[in-house]
Amino acid sequence: MANRLKEKYLNEVVPALTEQFNYSSVMAVPKVDKIVLNMGVGEAVSNAKSLEKAAEELALISGQKPLITKAKKSIAGFRLREGVAIGAKVTLRGERMYEFLDKLVSVSLPRVRDFHGVPTKSFDGRGNYTLGVKEQLIFPEINFDDVDKTRGLDIVIVTTANTDEESRALLTGLGMPFAK
């Protein structure tokens, strides 16, 4: 069974975008390429347990094992040495990517307090969208009682669109609630 967001993309979004931007081929229509979830855990320098907990939560949210990221260079001001584990990231593609995006749009974002839509200024000029989440509690997989500390995470939605306008039309079609 195909994911409902993928079906919506194929049946509704592709024809709408083809009409709006006059694409000559269905293959020219932009699509979501991958979603990268990143959780930077600065306190992992002094407390290794916090990184384990963050990675565990990221695995619950994404449904796949996160990659532990390490510091590229030493920064004395942050008491950071090169090669020390300071974060975790997950790259979602295919079915898991559509499942996560569907869950993000329909369940998680509406749970954000005082939510008026995601900002429209977070496109990078190449058709990719970046979204910061202040707390991991908005995701239904995270049990409120098991959380030791609220942590934020970055969500990067990478699309094959060439412009921000095309990317915004794609994400709007997929149900992303942009602020008016």
From Swiss-Prot:
GO cellular component, one term: ribonucleoprotein complex
Keyword list, A-Z: Ribonucleoprotein, Ribosomal protein, RNA-binding, rRNA-binding, tRNA-binding
GO molecular function ontology, one term from the record: rRNA binding
Database matches in InterPro entries: Ribosomal_uL5 (IPR002132), Ribosomal_uL5_bac-type (IPR020930), Ribosomal_uL5_C (IPR031309), Ribosomal_uL5_CS (IPR020929), Ribosomal_uL5_dom_sf (IPR022803), Ribosomal_uL5_N (IPR031310)
UniProt xrefs under Pfam families: Ribosomal_L5, Ribosomal_L5_C
Keyword rRNA-binding: yes
A single GO BP: translation
Domain of life: Bacteria
Family: Belongs to the universal ribosomal protein uL5 family.
Chain's role: This is one of the proteins that bind and probably mediate the attachment of the 5S RNA into the large ribosomal subunit, where it forms part of the central protuberance. In the 70S ribosome it contacts protein S13 of the 30S subunit (bridge B1b), connecting the 2 subunits; this bridge is implicated in subunit movement. Contacts the P site tRNA; the 5S rRNA and some of its associated proteins might help stabilize positioning of ribosome-bound tRNAs.
UniProt xrefs under HAMAP family: Ribosomal_uL5_B
NCBIfam families: PRK00010.1
Quaternary context: Part of the 50S ribosomal subunit; part of the 5S rRNA/L5/L18/L25 subcomplex. Contacts the 5S rRNA and the P site tRNA. Forms a bridge to the 30S subunit in the 70S ribosome.
Record protein name field: Large ribosomal subunit protein uL5
Organism annotation: Streptococcus pneumoniae serotype 2 (strain D39 / NCTC 7466)
